[in-house]
Amino acid sequence: IAQDKEVDHLFFTGSTRVGKEVAKYAAENLTPTTLELGGKSPAYITNSASLTKSLQRIILGKMLNAGQTCIAPDYLIVDRKHELNFVETFFKILANLYPEIMENSDYSAIINKERLEHLLQLLEDARDKGGDIYILSEGTVEKLQNKKNISEMTTISGKPERKLTPSLVLNPNFRMNLLNEEIFGPILPVFFVESDTEALNLVEKNQRPLAFYWFGDQKEPRQKWLKNIVAGGVTINDCLLHCVQNDLPFGGVSCSGSGTYHGIWGFENFSHRKSIFKQSRFSAMKSVSPPYTKTKYKLLRMLRFLI
């Protein structure tokens, strides 16, 4: 389709890797594209935010379709003020939202076996590179030790559902594969930071995200973030909701996509404004056409200041 000369406009939703291929093939015919590519969308819980309220909303956004949405929070940055009670609070809220989560029909499966195996590989890689992985096992928060088999601990065994238990990865680092690609699953790396500057530096280590989520009650820091962050869209004190506003454009920037849609922006993006001019019976062009007399030169000089 991308190479079809009859296509007027291509809209693609998917990974950045495939989006580059679509754009490359479309460029052969100069076909315009709109690319919605996802990426690594961060959430930031500031020191002025309520940890409980923020996590309730972040968990809802992350666990929708088991993290398999293009604007799911991909990793979490948390002010160190909240570190002491973070893990306990996270899993308490998770258990309230999804009782007996692995048997809960409200909690989605992973799309296919290959994707599930890839997510398990991300967890093993994170553990091998120094990450602390926490899960909820039979109502108890458990840290996965090196001797534990991650596959046995985190998936339903002997059943076809392909469910993966939500996992926190603490002490993440950029050697881990899960910090170098969109996770697209129920795995949440968590960074604890001392300042807004440290948080912003973390965000800028990754490519420009499709979404950014900021949690807090202080206006001045919020405005500073809105001024400095480069992202496709932002939701303040919640997740995902900027995407469902018909009076806001939705789309990515740089590696998270190009072009916007929704509402009037979608109509204009997918339309071509064809200019049409019909000359009247009498044309003024005769007054400025050769031969150029002194009178015509004066007229042209006058027109130069009017146009």
Question: What function would you assign to each model-found segment?
Answer:
Residues 3, 56, 60, 112, ...:
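Phosphate-coordinating loops and pocket residues in cytosolic domains that bind phosphorylated ligands
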Residues 7, 153-159, 163-307:
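Conserved C-terminal structural/oligomerization subdomain of aldehyde/semialdehyde dehydrogenase
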Residues 9, 15-173, 236, 304-305:
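ALDH superfamily catalytic-core signature
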Residues 4, 130, 206:
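Acidic-histidine catalytic/liganding microenvironments
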Residues 2, 22-25, 88-89, 226-227, ...:
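Short amphipathic alpha-helical segments
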Residues 1, 23, 66-67, 177-178, ...:
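Short, flexible, glycine/charge-rich loop motifs used to bind or transfer phosphoryl groups or to couple energy/partner
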Residues 1-8:
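Short intrinsically disordered, low-complexity coil segments enriched in acidic
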